[in-house]
Amino acid sequence: RLPKGKPFFGQIQLKGGKTKPRNLSDNEKTDPANVTVPADYPQNDLYRRVVAKHCDTIRSEDKVIGAILAALKEDGLEETTIVVYFSDHGANNLVRHKQQPTEAGLHVPFMIRGPEKWVPKKGQVRNDLVSILDLSATTLTWAGIEYPKWIEGQNLFAKDFKPREFVGSGRDRCDHTIDRIRTVRTE
């Protein structure tokens, strides 16, 4: 347990789509017959099973996250703790998603929960284009540290926050293959 009244930083790395669903009973698992396979993939049983497993993995991780949030509440930390959930890449279940700078590879979950002082407008959904650099600027602000003006990120909750017109991304290698790709994403 955490010491009472002291600030803390914790990082919990979940395995995401890199593992089998751990905590779902058979009756909780997704029926492959009920999933939608993206149009650019073969519409067959193999891909339906892959997509169903991915759905189950997400639900399995949801349970783990729920347990973490419940523990924070039980310890009286729910109203004083900021929780940030994000991924380092998009979907991991199909070819071209994880390692390619495409919409499927770049669109990541990004959720923040915390006290209103730091995370205003509880339950708000924003569709702004953001960069992981923005998370750096935001967390420095939460810690009371002024971030350098040269940093390319911005505090997502600042009064003067300006939505980005575009975000850039890239890939330099995939495993042992050098393959430099750059992208620009706009609305």
Positions of PLM-derived features:
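Active-site-proximal cap/lid insertion segments
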Residues: 1-133, 140-150
